Amino acid sequence: MQQRNTPVEGTAARRNASVAVAAGTVLGLVALSGGTAHAATPTDHGRPVAQIIGGTEKPDGSYPFMAALLIKGKGKPLDRHFCGGSLLSPDVVMTAAHCVDDVKPKQIETVVGRTVLSSKKQGHLRNIRTITIHPRYNGDYDVAFLELDKPVYGIAPVNLPTPGTDALIRPGSKATVAGWGNTDTEVPTHPDRLRAVNVPIVSHIECKATYSNYNKKVHVCAGVEGKDSCQGDSGGPLFRTLKGRKGVYQIGVVSYGDGCAAQGAPGVYTYTGSAQLWDTLWKSAEGKRVKRLLNR
């Protein structure tokens, strides 16, 4: 299984390898050889990582709340990209904990509102001031918060569900997942342009039957054969719009899955409507700081 970069044993995270390795070895090889190498990501606790499978390219300006996490360096943005994220407030980007576990703020940067990674004219590039990982992260509670060095204005952040409600994750309802992750289950292919795919929400019962470590209190499943997130999409948002309401509601953070877009193996997301996710965060010293940044 893979993390859409990689947590819990037996599954895979959906990010693109280790920041430490990429910052040193990968970017060094690119500089010396003139070749290309896709960035790696941090430790994933044994689970698999994610990319968009079965999706379509999005036009410039689509989903401006999307964030791309990049390893700092001289390489091309596509080669330095390792995870996704979403703008939660002008000062905070939310991503997966496994993307930034054991990573120092000075090692990475993020760009918000960019559709094409190579287009430096698009979006807002920001350094990272602090990284806060959920205090209960151990594969579950796979969420982290990046405090930006400067606010991002002019882009509407995503909305979050009311904690404790399951109204937005009814089985069969449709949501969208977006990212710059792998697009081919056989040959790793990482796109320069943002891609997205619509996926159905899968019941807790079905997900538990597939993943023994699935925790319905903090997880939600989505995807169908041929349509899924994949490696490189980790940390990105699973979201939907609501009739009669403005903006986008993020219901999940890309976490892990068994392969990508495989039959009977939907992607697993950290559920952002989980009361337990937020209650346990707010009670921690780190969480109190995030709460202040989000004005909650």
List PLM regions with ranges.
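Secretory targeting and sorting signals
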Residues: 1-40
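Acidic glycine-/aspartate-rich tracts in secreted/extracellular proteins
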Residues: 72-74, 98-102, 113-118, 149-154, ...
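C-terminal subregion of chymotrypsin/trypsin-like serine protease catalytic domains
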Residues: 40-42, 87-93, 97, 108-109, ...
